[in-house]
Amino acid sequence: MTTDFLFPKIADCSYVSCYCEENVWKLCEQVKRTRPEELSKCYAVFVSNEGRTVPLWRQKAGRGDDQVVIWDYHVFFMHNPLPNRCLVFDLDTTLPFPTYFHKYVTETFRSDLALRPEHHRFFRVIPADTYLIEFSSDRRHMRRPDGSWIKPPPSYPPILSNTNLHCLGDFICMSAGKGPGAVYSLSEFVQNFYKSPHVGVQQNK
């Protein structure tokens, strides 16, 4: 894969296990700081559904040869500089970092056709600049009833917006018309962000 990557190495990225929404926020922040001209081509993508049971393959936390795991939600970063050059940066995948959109979707989500309806995946796609402004989390979802942490939090302070203390649920929600960005089914997501390099090529006769 040859391209001018926004993030040269995965080791250059802020990462804390089980805080994917914050990891992606940090990627957006890094682009704004180092490559601001590319920010308008970047997105934060939440994956979930009504029951918050979404199977993903090729995940570091997955089991078996296929490395499949069922998350309540997941978040990854996309850079879409050209119609057929969309790249996915997922800090939790076992695929390369980054991976071209088509390969990532094919190996990570496969198809909804073989899944029960309650496991179908939906995608909330949020422009990176919107995500930087509107995302806010006090990390309450990672605390047990006694106040202890389910997983250790990042060492930096919580990411809080000026208007909301905790709005993570609005991003995980897959109801159209609610929350920032746009919500797609798996097929709609592919139709919107995958453009075959052969589409639109005219041949001389």
Swiss-Prot record:
The active site is at C20, H74, D90. The keyword rRNA processing does not apply. Pfam families: Nt_Gln_amidase. One of its GO terms (cellular component) is nucleus. Keywords: Hydrolase. It catalyses: N-terminal L-glutaminyl-[protein] + H2O = N-terminal L-glutamyl-[protein] + NH4(+). Gene3D superfamilies: Protein N-terminal glutamine amidohydrolase, alpha beta roll. GO terms for molecular function: protein-N-terminal asparagine amidohydrolase activity; protein-N-terminal glutamine amidohydrolase activity. Signal peptide: none annotated. Its EC number is 3.5.1.122. It is an enzyme of class 3 (hydrolase). PANTHER family: PROTEIN N-TERMINAL GLUTAMINE AMIDOHYDROLASE (PTHR13035:SF0). Mediates the side-chain deamidation of N-terminal glutamine residues to glutamate, an important step in N-end rule pathway of protein degradation. Conversion of the resulting N-terminal glutamine to glutamate renders the protein susceptible to arginylation, polyubiquitination and degradation as specified by the N-end rule. Does not act on substrates with internal or C-terminal glutamine and does not act on non-glutamine residues in any position. Belongs to the NTAQ1 family. Monomer. This is Protein N-terminal glutamine amidohydrolase.
